[in-house]
Amino acid sequence: MVGVKPTYGVVSRYGVVAFGSSLDQVGPFARSVEDAALAMNALVRGGSDHMDCTSQSIATDFTANLEEGVKGMRIGIVPTFMEAEGLDAEVKERIEEAGRKLEAAGAELVEGELPNAQAAMSAYYVLGPCEAFSNLARFDSVRYGYCVEGCKDLNEQYELSRAGGFGVEARRRIMLGSYLLSSGVYDKYYYPAQQVRTLITQDYMYAYHKVDCILAPVSPRTAFKFGEINDPTSMYLSDMFTISINIAGNGGMSVPVGLGVASGLPIGAQLIAPAFRDENMLRVAAELERCYGKAPIAPAFAKAGE
């Protein structure tokens, strides 16, 4: 499975129920890089959407350079990601192997640094819940959202409808956002998180002076089965390599680079593009797909589907 998260503003968010307005982005899942690129062409349609003020006018054919290979491209390897605590040795080896394959195909591997990337998770779990609290407040069961019938009064309707309409994680983030935006707390957490966001965005801008695309893990471990992990902290840590690009607004995508030996489940390489140069990551992804072949269905899922 190939997944694409475009640069913020490339695809219109019109029609999307907002969770975090500065973080939400629409992108495709596909069985191949070419399919993902074709889906991107359909989503973008060559222009901005007047229904979304963040939408940019992009006139790019995302399939145009899929066959060009990576010769002459500079691929960034970031020690902050590759030496991160908690990164599974098997995942690390697969990403390093992917780098070697790209180098053999003519790319140049360049070591880069994102000095503030380690602070991305802390900043995200301030900014995300704050935006979620603001956006989801409209779902009051009267004007918008799920409504429990037969309540004795309006307060009970609000309480039961919001409790029943939102899942556990959504409620957790709404409550956290409410606290973080409260008087006396806002200046202590929200404002510094925005400053960290600016620093991370600048880090990526500086990094792309030297590279055309960054190669990194998607997750610190192989894919896990649905329901296997219930601890919220462990779930949050599974996003440790993808959060910084959401904060910065850069495009990123996942492309399979093999299956875990023990689990038989996929390992993904993350490709991170400069802002509004999403075609770069698709070009590199197409080369990796040629190296590894199109992703097979994981045996565990193939068996379940028989």
Regions found by a protein language model. Give the residues of each.
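Glycine-rich, small-residue loops and helix-cap segments
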Residues: K101, E108-L109, A119-M121, G128-S134, ...
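Short acidic loop-to-helix transition motifs that present clustered carboxylates
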Residues: I58, A117-A119
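Short, solvent-exposed loop/turn segments at secondary-structure boundaries
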Residues: G86-E90, A123, E228-N230
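A short beta-strand-loop structural module common to alpha/beta enzyme folds
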Residues: E111-P115
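A short helix-breaking turn/cap at a secondary-structure junction
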Residues: V2-E93, E97-A98, C151-L160, R290-E306
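Conserved catalytic core of Hanks-type protein kinase domains
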Residues: A42, V126-L127
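A glycine- and small-aliphatic-rich helix-loop capping segment at beta-alpha/alpha-beta transitions
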Residues: M1-G3, P232-T233
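N-terminal G-site helix/loop of the GST-like fold
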Residues: D88, E103-A104
